[in-house]
């Protein structure tokens, strides 16, 4: 019986490189490689055993062989056998190559060229070192980005929940968006902890199911985040375009779209993976057709948001050019335009640029998707909460009540409303005395 195979020369260093950073379609973990290696070994030994049992008498030549890397079939003397690189090496290098052995009267010759050279496992390639260093820096950047975003989003979500006067449909949608960014950051940290933890092969089988569940949760959080970005775009577009827009009725539909539709697609993906591609931890998407179950809806949501972005800019430009928009109306539309220009590009429009990107643009794509994308939650929290005039007013009043022991001032807050394509301004006294009005009911941003 052959001994349990260990990773060949160069595999450990390659796995260290693979675990340097989280990537979309990242290199596999050591456990994934060992699972594939064990599957190939078991399959080879079964085929060799069936071949041995089917022979009535020994055949002269070279017997079938498992050399801990490849499965060599029986061969007659004087022949050269060619095999493609084993699957576990192709998982690491994404390159095809061939291995050769000669069958002589004395048996098999050594494999040539060496598997690490034939299959692209070059340990002296300086480009691997540069890429390794780049991925390490990238991992540090997106870890800082997700951490800072997580802190700011938690604070922003707490503020919107704490002040009842800020409770309205618009801010309810913002809360859901903040929560989706929080889940995205947390799922990324959990996934990194599972995928890039100590990969002791003894514990591979014990963590296999849990690792898949983590990947399902991670994919759900990613899709939910894109779904709520789409909801933000649909909501803003509806306020500008639809004459009679019932916000409360649409909120229920938005909740179903934001949390329900990702669950449907991720469940379909998980079931498909289980039956058609149940290999590894489900972090490698070798089957493009299965991966498009998730990738397709995400790209579609990005495309829809981009179309909404263009139409919103068209509407705002038309309103800004009309003669009726003057004074405070003009300032309001400029504020709306600035917020839109800052927010909509953050919806992930840059993904469209990299959908069919060439292989040489991978580093640029990773920088946009991971390094800059990890700060997306921070920017959204600042834009939707900390720079919001209504939020600042409520926090200022509460600060004065708690620390200055003085009655808060009574500033006049200007708000606007849209009705039948026209705009109007309303002034609201923000005093604690008397009946207070909801300061966010008629505001768009």
Swiss-Prot record:
Phosphorylated on Ser and Thr residues at the cytoplasmic C-terminus by G protein-coupled receptor kinases (GRKs). It comes from Oryctolagus cuniculus (Rabbit). Belongs to the G-protein coupled receptor 2 family. The chain crosses the membrane at residues 138-163, 171-191, 213-235, 251-272, 288-311, 337-352, 364-387. G protein-coupled receptor activated by secretin (SCT), which is involved in different processes such as regulation of the pH of the duodenal content, food intake and water homeostasis. Ligand binding causes a conformation change that triggers signaling via guanine nucleotide-binding proteins (G proteins) and activates cAMP-dependent pathway. Upon binding to secretin, regulates the pH of the duodenum by (1) inhibiting the secretion of gastric acid from the parietal cells of the stomach and (2) stimulating the production of bicarbonate (NaHCO(3)) from the ductal cells of the pancreas. The keyword Cell membrane applies. Residues 22-137, 192-212, 273-287, 353-363 are extracellular. Disulfide bonds join 44-71, 62-103, 85-119, 211-281. InterPro entries: GPCR_2, GPCR_2-like_7TM, GPCR_2_extracell_dom_sf, GPCR_2_extracellular_dom, GPCR_2_secretin-like, GPCR_2_secretin-like_CS, GPCR_2_secretin_rcpt, Secretin_7TM. One of its GO terms (molecular function) is G protein-coupled peptide receptor activity. GO terms for biological process: adenylate cyclase-activating G protein-coupled receptor signaling pathway; cell surface receptor signaling pathway; diet induced thermogenesis; intracellular water homeostasis; regulation of appetite; regulation of synaptic plasticity; response to nutrient levels. This is Secretin receptor. Gene3D superfamilies: GPCR, family 2, extracellular hormone receptor domain, Rhodopsin 7-helix transmembrane proteins. The gene is SCTR. Glycans are attached at residues 68, 96, 102, 124.
């Amino acid at each position: 019986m052959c001994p349990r195979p260990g990773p060949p020369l160069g595999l450990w260093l390659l796995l260290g490189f693979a675990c340097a950073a989280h990537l979309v379609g990242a290199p596999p973990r050591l456990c994934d490689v060992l699972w594939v290696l064990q599957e190939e070994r078991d399959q080879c030994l079964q085929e060799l055993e069936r071949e041995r049992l089917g022979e009535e008498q020994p055949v002269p030549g070279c017997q079938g062989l498992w050399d801990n890397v490849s499965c060599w079939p029986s061969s007659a003397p004087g022949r050269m056998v060619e095999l493609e690189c084993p699957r576990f090496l192709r998982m690491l290098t994404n390159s095809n190559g061939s291995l050769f052995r000669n069958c002589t009267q004395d048996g098999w010759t050594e494999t040539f060229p060496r598997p690490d050279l034939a299959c692209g496992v070059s340990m002296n390639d300086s480009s691997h070192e540069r890429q390794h260093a780049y991925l390490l820096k990238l991992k540090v950047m997106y870890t800082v980005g997700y951490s800072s975003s997580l802190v700011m989003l938690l604070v922003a979500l707490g503020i919107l929940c704490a002040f009842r006067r800020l409770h309205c449909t618009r801010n309810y949608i913002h809360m859901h968006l903040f929560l989706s960014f929080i889940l995205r950051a947390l799922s990324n940290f959990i996934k990194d902890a599972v995928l890039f933890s100590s990969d002791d092969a003894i514990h591979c089988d014990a963590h296999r199911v849990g690792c898949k569940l983590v990947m399902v949760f991670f994919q759900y959080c990613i899709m939910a985040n894109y779904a709520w970005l789409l909801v933000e775009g649909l909501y803003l577009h509806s306020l500008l375009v639809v004459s009679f827009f019932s916000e409360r009725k649409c909120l229920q539909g938005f909740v179903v779209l934001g949390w329900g539709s990702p669950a449907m697609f991720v469940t379909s993906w998980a079931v498909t993976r289980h039956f058609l591609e149940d290999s590894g931890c489900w972090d490698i998407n070798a089957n493009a057709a299965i991966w498009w179950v998730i990738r397709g809806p995400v790209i579609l949501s990005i495309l829809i948001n981009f179309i909404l972005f263009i139409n919103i800019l068209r509407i705002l430009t038309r309103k800004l050019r009309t003669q009726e928009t003057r004074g405070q109306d003009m300032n309001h539309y400029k504020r709306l335009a600035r917020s839109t220009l800052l927010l909509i590009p953050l919806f992930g429009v840059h993904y469209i640029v990299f959908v069919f990107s060439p292989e040489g643009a991978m580093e640029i794509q990773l920088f946009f998707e991971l390094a800059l994308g990890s700060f997306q939650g921070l920017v959204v929290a600042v834009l939707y909460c900390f720079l919001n005039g209504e939020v600042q007013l409520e926090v200022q009043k509460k600060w004065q009540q708690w620390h200055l022991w003085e009655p808060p001032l009574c500033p006049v807050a200007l708000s606007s409303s849209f009705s039948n394509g026209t705009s109007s301004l309303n002034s609201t006294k923000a005093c604690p005395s008397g009946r207070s009005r909801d300061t966010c009911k008629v505001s768009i941003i």
